[in-house]
Amino acid sequence: ANAMATEQGFYALAAVWRRREGKNALFQLSDAPENKDAVSGAGKTAIGLPGKNAAVTPNAIKYPGRTFADIASHPSRRHIEALAARGVINGKSELLFDPESGVTRAEFCAMAVRALGLQLTGAQSSVFTDVTDADWFAPYVRTAYAFGLVNGVSEAEFAPNGSITREQAAVMTARAAGLCGLDTSLSESGVRDALSVFTDYRQVSGYAKNAMAFCLSNGIFDIQTAALVPQELETRAELADGLFGLLNLADLL
């Protein structure tokens, strides 16, 4: 009995580790049947928060063990692998992820829509003149726009190939958090407390302050440097970190 208890204890510890890593469950330790999804961890099925938009759904693990040669020693490796396993993010090729390259507005739409498990909006007259049905990203842009995740750079243009900055990523991520049922509002003092620990907090644009503070105070963004550099371009690795943090907070992993 003691040996069995010890063995189950080790399995439980392993399951907790896999849950933290964003991986699926290890074993079912109970004899009782349980309806579980492939995104479950340690006997727990990810179902999202009670107040989430009904269209937001967890992603099952589709590609277990997916990784890339250029992230082996990268600090964002486990987040990238967890999202890649769910089909949320792809590499630049089968072997390379290119973690330090920038993210376009179209790429953000694709990753965010997949992360939230949103059904793609069908072909229709585009809101933006620079997004056509022939573009691979068109359904993702339409869907992200329909759910309020993104806006155009003008009433007519979306600028799909434009890069996004760290503060722009914060705004879009906070909008996604709202869809997930999270309260993204902060008091003025809450915003100040979250931002003022960084030396360049005054450089955060007014429109992005609440969103940036929300992402920081909830651990969605884990910035370990003294400066926020909010105008710096968001990297693919940083976006993976942010999406993983959001999904974990929203009980979607």
Residue ranges and their predicted role:
Residues Y207-A213, S217:
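C-terminal, surface-exposed recognition/capping segments
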Residues A15-S30, E34:
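Extracellularly exposed regions in secreted/surface proteins, prominently low-complexity, repeat-rich
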Residues Q28-R77, N90-C109, V113-Y140, F147-E167, ...:
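Feature responds to low-complexity, polar/acidic, surface-exposed segments characteristic
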Residues A1-E21, A110, S163, V171, ...:
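An alpha-helical repeat/solenoid feature that recognizes helix-turn-helix modules
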Residues I80-L83, C109-A112, A144, A213-C215:
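A short amphipathic alpha-helical interaction element
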Residues L239-A240:
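Preference for long, well-ordered alpha-helical segments
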Residues A12, V16-R19, N218, L246-L249:
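Hydrophobic alpha-helical segments
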